[in-house]
Amino acid sequence: METHNHDVPWESAYGYVQALKHGDTIYISGQLSHDGADLVAPAPVENGRATSFEQMEAQMRQTYVNAAKLLERFGATLDNVVEEVVYVLDIPAAFAVAGKVRKEAYGRPDPQVASTLVGTNGLAFPEQLVEIKFIARV
């Protein structure tokens, strides 16, 4: 098996790898909107909860960028993705931007990717609005 990480503090704190290739399948752990150890477009938080979903699009874009970086380390691209699961704090906010962001990320008007959108009440960091896991085939 081949593995890759982003080398961010929460990998060792939680104890996992960002991506793992087994055979011809690449499994990408839930990706967040970060650039190194810094969160990108963090949502405002009050009492441990996001108070606005206005950064959904920016966070979603960075999440696809992070997935693409991992795939590149295996010699793959987002074109190799066969399935994604999108976890969000607010389904209407995500649905409003997901089509546009996904089409741009995959570079086509009809991404050939099985996709599931799931609403959840929390993610790894309270500032996060979206997390996406991927499966790719090479």
Annotated model-derived regions:
Residues 1-65, 69-82, 88-138:
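N-terminal presequence-like segments and the immediate start of the first folded domain
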